[in-house]
Structures are given as structure tokens and as C-alpha cells.
Amino acid sequence: MDPTDLSFSPDEINKLIETGLNTVEYFTSQQVTGTSSLGKNTIPPGVTGLLTNAAEAKIQESTNHQKGSVGGGAKPKKPRPKIAIVPADDKTVPGKPIPNPLLGLDSTPSTQTVLDLSGKTLPSGSYKGVKLAKFGKENLMTRFIEEPRENPIATSSPIDFKRGAGIPAGSIEGSTQSDGWEMKSRSLSGAIHPVLQSPLQQGDLNALVTSVQSLALNVNEILNTVRNLDSRMNQLETKVDRILSSQSLIQTIKNDIVGLKAGMATLEGMITTVKIMDPGVPSNVTVEDVRKTLSNHAVVVPESFNDSFLTQSEDVISLDELARPTATSVKKIVRKVPPQKDLTGLKITLEQLAKDCISKPKMREEYLLKINQASSEAQLIDLKKAIIRSAI
């Protein structure tokens, strides 16, 4: 049997409406606190207009009560609001969504009849069958949640709600999420205006919930890797700081090297000057041969002199006791032979000099042989000069 074919008597309709109004008045009579505000952000969409009006009426009633208590007057009883009832329509399509009967608003145009609850007479007409009545009552019991319920409360035994009375256990199920009605509130006072949508766009990257569990196992490894990288970066920064701090020392070393090069150049110049000033003996000519080549000339010796350099048959003019020049016959000069000196130290010195200054092995061996065969100091001196010239 189709439930839409059933009809209700005026008494049953009045009883249903009375039950719904008692429910609404019960919720609107509760004390409004900061956490249970009736703003638009806490009221489910679709019933904002009704609850806002109820909140405003509650505030007005509280204000009138305070004024009446001060003046000592009795509080007048507020008449119940009028509810719009939509007449039954025989052309109802099965499966069509049924609007909320408390709002009195329908997206499709229809005629409405005003029901005055203060009177006892009821106009003709009924809700759209028992399905509409069940829908309205379920919305009242679940705080106007539009999600369909699998086990609705039986209409044969309605619960008697009273103002200020406690709610029996199990009479109201837990609230669930509601998509709300796409309908704006007609009341602008006493309600929070709707919040504008943020212009920020959400990112296109999405994360799958199924991969979270597997990826969570890698979090510790990733964190350890990041910590290791951080420590290595700190070590690198420390090493770079040390290198930068030693840059000044490197510059000092470079300056010292430049100074050493300048000193070496100075020494080379001085050595070259010494070589120029000491040309050495051009040949092996003895002093006696040099004296023979010189012309005869007078030599004045004012003091006592050594006649070892004089030769035989040469006239010498000398001064007598009165400082008069007189000719002096010179006896035959016997050249004095100086005592033999120890040449071992000088030979060792010349051998070391030949090893250090002469790079050619053959020439070095010749000089070493001559040094060992030398028997006089003069020969060793000549070898010394020859070694120095060969080194240059």
C-alpha cells in the first residue's frame, strides 16, 4: 500500500504539530553561551532562518522578563508562531525530495494555507502523506539533519516533550554531518554573516592515504640523513673558516719569499763585483822576471829595510848617520829559504773546494792529483786560484 494514499485527521495533524513545536521550544529555551552560539557557523545550513528568529525571540523574551521583574508586572504569554502548511498535491512524483515543513519554503511554486495554532479550528488539507510527517518529525528529533535514517522513530508512540524537561536516554541519536540547504537566511540581524571564500587556491598535489603507512616507516631514516648532512655541512664550514683564517699567513710567506729573492739578487751582484775587482794572476811569471822587465830607478828607504829583495852588483844609496845619501856596497845576497810549513790543512781545504766547485769529474780528478803532488805553499795557492777560475 502506498503511504502517500493515507490521510490524517485534524486531531492527528494537531498532535504532530504540537510535538514539533514543543521540540523547537525546548532547544530554543536553553541558555545561550559563548560555546553554543547560534551564529551561522554553528547552525546547520537549511534551518538558519528558523533558529535565528527563535534566538531573537528568546533574547527579546529575556529582555521583557527583566523589565517586567523590575516593574512588578506579570509576563504576558507570547502567542505561538504561525506555520505554513502546503496543501496536498495529487500529482506528487514518487521519490521526489520532500522539503522541510518547518521552513515553509519550497523551490517550486505552490499555494500555502496559514494555520493559527491559537484557535481550535483547522483548515482542510493535509501533509503529503505519512512520509512527509515522518520526515518532519525526524528532522525535529535530529536537530534538522537531512541525512536519512535507517531506523526512524515509530510514529505510533511519540515522545511527550515538555519545556525544561530532560531528554530520555536513547531518544536522540548522535549527530552526523549534514550537507545543508543551499538557501540563504532572510534575517540579517542576530546572525553572523556568511564568511567569504578564501581567494587562495589549493595546490594540485594530493597525497594518497593508502601510501601514508608505508611512507611513515622512512621518516626516521630521512631525519637521520638530514642530520648527517647538517653535521657534514658544519664540518665543511669549519674547514673553510680555517682556510680563510690561514690566508693571511700565506700572504706573509709570499712576502718573505719576495724578500729572499731580492736578497739573493743583491748577493749575486756583490759576488760579481768581487770577481771584477780580483782578476787574478794572468800567467805563471815569477816576481823576479817582473823585476827584470822594469827599468832601473832610485828607491829611497828611510828606515831599516830588508835586503832580501836586492840582487847582486846593484848600487844602493843609503843615508848615513847624518842623513846624508851615500853609496853603499852591497854584499852578495843570499836568499833566505823560509822554513817548511805544514801543508796538510791547506791541501784538505783545496780538495774540498775542488769537489764543491768543479762539476766535471775528469777535471776534478786532475786538480785533486795536483793538490796531492804539491810540495810548497805557492803551488797550493796557484792551484786555489785555478780552481776558483774554473768554477766561474
From Swiss-Prot:
Q: What is this protein called?
A: Phosphoprotein
Q: What family is this protein classified in?
A: Belongs to the rubulavirus/avulavirus P protein family.
Q: Where is this region: Multimerization?
A: 217-280
Q: Provide the alphabetized UniProt keywords.
A: Coiled coil, Phosphoprotein, Viral RNA replication
Q: Tell me if Phosphoprotein is a UniProt keyword of this record.
A: yes
Q: What is known of its domains?
A: The N-terminus consists of a long intrinsically disordered tail. The central part contains the coiled-coil multimerization domain (PMD). Forms a four-stranded coiled coil structure. The C-terminus constitutes the alpha-helical domain that binds to the nucleocapsid (N-RNA complex).
Upper classification of the source organism reads:
Viruses, Riboviria, Orthornavirae, Negarnaviricota, Haploviricotina
Region of interest (Disordered), ranges: 61-107, 152-182
